């Protein structure tokens, strides 16, 4: 939901334009992106490759469930671009940090990484403090005394639930995603087309 200009340095309209720009840059930098130099263009349905079709299916899958969005590298990148316009990218960054943390096998690395994540996202006045309740924060602090791969599970679940309930629906309703989904739908319907999609309007 848009807040007052006193709360944010940019208006809702400017934030929407910023998301489109970020998403366009994301597409352009993607390995699947157009090499024309135009931001927001994409080779959706090249007859010489299945990559365009696969990407369009990926895009359409993002609205099926939050799990599918988070399991897609492109989806995470697009969602992160959107969250930056809402000044809430720390939620996704924390979730991703927890996912990487769980992959660690060294007890020494677990301990040091756990403290870095706590200092960056969990403790009061953290530079990227996420919105969790006091009880969850203190539980996580206690877990750090003997850090394991699951010591952030409670906090990660709370943040994920917040994103799924709050940010994810707004992402799906955003003009930029709807434009992208429209292009993806058209590409899926015409897989043999080699014409680039229309650029996102900014």
Curated annotation (Swiss-Prot):
<keyword id="KW-0597">Phosphoprotein</keyword>
<dbReference type="InterPro" id="IPR024066">
    <property type="entry name" value="RGS_subdom1/3"/>
</dbReference>
<keyword id="KW-0343">GTPase activation</keyword>
<comment type="subunit">
    <text>Interacts with GNAI1 and GNAQ. Interacts with GNAI3, GNAI3 and GNAO1.</text>
</comment>
<feature type="lipid moiety-binding region" description="S-palmitoyl cysteine">
    <location>
        <position position="12"/>
    </location>
</feature>
<keyword id="KW-0449">Lipoprotein</keyword>
<feature type="lipid moiety-binding region" description="S-palmitoyl cysteine">
    <location>
        <position position="2"/>
    </location>
</feature>
<keyword id="KW-0734">Signal transduction inhibitor</keyword>
<dbReference type="GO" id="GO:0043547">
    <property type="term" value="P:positive regulation of GTPase activity"/>
</dbReference>
<protein>
    <recommendedName>
        <fullName>Regulator of G-protein signaling 16</fullName>
    </recommendedName>
</protein>
<feature type="region of interest" description="Disordered">
    <location>
        <begin position="183"/>
        <end position="202"/>
    </location>
</feature>
<keyword id="KW-0472">Membrane</keyword>
<dbReference type="Pfam" id="PF00615">
    <property type="entry name" value="RGS"/>
</dbReference>
<dbReference type="GO" id="GO:0009968">
    <property type="term" value="P:negative regulation of signal transduction"/>
</dbReference>
<dbReference type="InterPro" id="IPR044926">
    <property type="entry name" value="RGS_subdomain_2"/>
</dbReference>
<dbReference type="InterPro" id="IPR036305">
    <property type="entry name" value="RGS_sf"/>
</dbReference>
<dbReference type="GO" id="GO:0007186">
    <property type="term" value="P:G protein-coupled receptor signaling pathway"/>
</dbReference>
<feature type="modified residue" description="Phosphotyrosine">
    <location>
        <position position="177"/>
    </location>
</feature>
<comment type="function">
    <text>Regulates G protein-coupled receptor signaling cascades. Inhibits signal transduction by increasing the GTPase activity of G protein alpha subunits, thereby driving them into their inactive GDP-bound form. Plays an important role in the phototransduction cascade by regulating the lifetime and effective concentration of activated transducin alpha. May regulate extra and intracellular mitogenic signals.</text>
</comment>
<feature type="modified residue" description="Phosphotyrosine; by EGFR">
    <location>
        <position position="168"/>
    </location>
</feature>
<dbReference type="InterPro" id="IPR016137">
    <property type="entry name" value="RGS"/>
</dbReference>
<dbReference type="GO" id="GO:0005096">
    <property type="term" value="F:GTPase activator activity"/>
</dbReference>
<feature type="domain" description="RGS">
    <location>
        <begin position="65"/>
        <end position="181"/>
    </location>
</feature>
<keyword id="KW-0564">Palmitate</keyword>
<dbReference type="GO" id="GO:0005737">
    <property type="term" value="C:cytoplasm"/>
</dbReference>
<dbReference type="GO" id="GO:0016020">
    <property type="term" value="C:membrane"/>
</dbReference>
